[in-house]
Design a protein with these regions (language model features):
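Amphipathic alpha-helical segments in well-structured domains
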Residues: 88, 92-96, 119, 167, ...
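A structured beta-alpha segment of the ubiquitous adenosine-cofactor-binding alpha/beta core
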Residues: 44-45, 109-128
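N-terminal Rossmann-like NAD(P)+-binding subdomain of aldehyde/semialdehyde dehydrogenases
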Residues: 1-41
Length: 199
């Protein structure tokens, strides 16, 4: 229950703060320019042209909250082509259905529960993409600037020499960094590094 609630809270946070998210992503662009393709803002003539016809996503199974990453695409009028995680196809499917029920065009969504070959096709045919996976899955895309790779957790906790003797003050941070979301997120810490006592 706790993990489900936390993941859904992250998606809720992204949706309810979409105006702030879009402001950050667009640097305050008047979003009406997305519809017209051009306009004037801050005394400057602006034009908008998307860098991709669709955003490709190869989603993981470890956390429903990562679906919050593609939500701004819809507001930015960029279709999404999603390969859901094998064990967790439900969150992206439900989000897509909710967007369609709210009036978003069904054509803005592609939902393809497919294998690795299908995932590769999505990543290689969309102009921009995100891929989640282990090193064997993501390594082939590491040098492709059009594909944002989210691989296995390499996050570490570093306790400097100035703080190590007070390590008990940081137990809560260490615990949550390692175990939040059941320790399954790619941002979970996989080690605690203590240089003062390194061999």
């Amino acid at each position: 229950h706790v993990m489900v609630r936390r993941n859904m809270e992250k998606i809720h946070l992204a949706l309810t703060n979409m105006k702030t998210v879009l402001n950050g992503l667009s640097r305050g662009l008047d979003l009406a320019i997305l519809d017209s393709g051009s306009g004037e803002q801050f005394g400057t003539r602006l034009s908008y042209f998307p860098t991709t016809p669709a955003l490709g996503l190869v989603m993981p199974s470890n956390s429903p909250a990562v679906n919050s990453l593609w939500l701004p695409s819809i507001a930015l009028k960029t279709p999404v082509i999603i390969k859901p995680g094998k064990e967790e196809p439900w969150t992206p499917y439900r989000l897509i259905q909710a967007f369609i029920a709210a009036g978003a065009p069904a054509e803005a969504f592609g939902f393809y529960p497919t294998d690795h070959e299908g995932a590769g096709a999505i990543l290689n045919t969309c102009g921009r993409a995100l891929v989640f996976g282990d090193k064997s899955t993501t390594a082939q895309y590491a040098n492709n600037p059009a594909i944002q790779v989210h691989g296995p957790g390499w996050s570490k906790i570093l306790i400097g020499e100035d703080c190590i003797e007070h390590w008990r003050d940081y137990v809560d941070v260490m615990l949550s960094s390692i175990s939040d979301n059941g320790g399954r997120s790619c941002i979970n810490a996989s080690a605690i590094v203590v240089p003062k006592y390194a061999a």
